[in-house]
Amino acid sequence: DEETHESVAGIVAGRIKEKYNLPTIILTKGKDMPKGSARSIDEYNMFEELSKCKDLLDKFGGHPMAAGLSLSFENIDKLRQRLNENCKLTEEELIPKIRIDQRLPLKYVSFKLVDDIKSLEPFGKGNPSPLFAEKDIIIERVYVLGKEKNVFKLLIRPEESYNKINGLFFDSTGYFKETFLRVYDEVSYEKFLEGVLGDIRADIIYYPDINEYNGTITLQLVIKDIRFSTN
């Protein structure tokens, strides 16, 4: 992509990988030759696959999940063809997967739970943050926040309780709307955003967190995935 600067190639590759759950390489024009960044999924060792194509590359380096590379213009199509021919990914491996620690009804979300989770930090590749799931929660209202309109604040009521809690879903790819439209139509989506659709049910994957605003401390959920269902 001649319009993308090499400094943001990794960000673009990461977003495309997240949206489509596919290994992704973004090439930019570069100063002397095309340069690129690669981002991968757990099932595809990007560094190993690029190593099989090192005769086509000027330079490359990285690890299974990410890499950087440079190559001549005439080798771009050759690299694409060889990577695709060598790819052994199955349809099952391309299904996005989120591993949860356990199902946790929202009535068990507490300040103590958040403190206990924070005591396990720092989180990273070898020590992932715990993720929980709950089914059939009720979304009373949704608010769209942020300069880019990509943060969804959900007012959630658990099925077994009248205690409400806010949930935040950060979305840079349009996934929230895409997921909603698997069950409802465009008109319903607009009504949902306007707050006139009524209660919506969903299953969520989340982790509990604390929100501090104007001296007030409240519990909130950070939602990592959502699946809407009909009432």
Q: What are these regions, as identified by a protein language model?
A:
Residues 25-40:
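Short glycine-cluster motifs
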Residues 1, 27-29, 103, 170:
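Conserved beta-strand termini and adjacent loop/short-helix elements that scaffold enzyme active sites
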Residues 18, 39-231:
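Acidic, two-metal ion nucleic-acid-processing modules in DNA metabolism proteins
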Residues 1-14:
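Flexible, glycine/threonine-enriched loop-and-boundary segments that flank and lead into catalytic domains
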Residues 15-21:
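Hydrophobic/aromatic-rich, well-ordered segments within soluble, folded domains that form packed cores
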